[in-house]
Amino acid sequence: KPNKDKKISIICYNYPPGEANLFGGAFLDTFVSVSQILQRLVQEGYTTKALTPEELREVFTAGRAVNSGKYDCNWEGMIRYSTRNYHAPKEVTEHWGKAPGEIMAEEKEFLIPGVEVGNVLIGLQPARGRDSDQEQSYHDKTLPPHHQYIAFYQWLREEFRTDAVIHVGTHGTLEFLKGKESGLSQDCYPDYLIYDLPHFYLYYCGNPSEAVVAKRRSYAQIISYQPPVFEESDLYGQYLELSTEVDNYHQSLALSPAMAEQTL
């Protein structure tokens, strides 16, 4: 298939859910990274367009395409996936109730937070659980994913018909879903959701232990990235003023203790 006909899904994170935590990723400026990925895809002949980091941020914040927005949610702007096309293991219904459930759903449709830029989908990985138990459920390997989580990856495969998935940054939750540690089967949720899709994962090089989990449990091709370069920083603003006052105080102690008291 020529590049111009291929569809790519770029998946970013929104943890905890809401407007304040878009495009999270350890030691990574994810908006800049996704912008550069789009530029490279355009150069390689994919049907999409380049967006600046500022344009990407505007698309998701002004468009309110987020997981369970705390201030407002643009339900009309969400991609929708009908429950008529949805299928899930029995265990999911037993735990979360009848589809579509209460998380990112409206009537008989799932809400998919993301934008299509030509043949490229830039989406947000679903939250792991309800707002009240996000931290507890993040690495919980006994909790089955909720309906909208499963619907998100089904939509990528069956409706959007993606040719590859790229998870951007450390780290998401797909690789920590319920199932065996190795030798996964279709009864294991990472396998059930990613199955045979080509999967690329941008992962921080300082976290090889969890990168191995992503490789083993979600069949990811790991693309390592380095942390930002550390640089010496000068004082600025009130910190600079405070440093000057401290220096003046110590000089006054030696020359005129009375003036030192006035400095305090």
Predicted regions and their residues:
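Non-catalytic accessory regions outside enzyme or core folds
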Residues: 7, 255, 259-264
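Extended, H/D-rich, highly charged conserved domains that either
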Residues: 13-124
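Solvent-exposed alpha-helices and their adjacent loops that cap or buttress functional pockets
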Residues: 2-4, 112-116, 157-159
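Flexible, glycine/charged-enriched surface loops at secondary-structure junctions
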Residues: 2, 47-55, 257-261
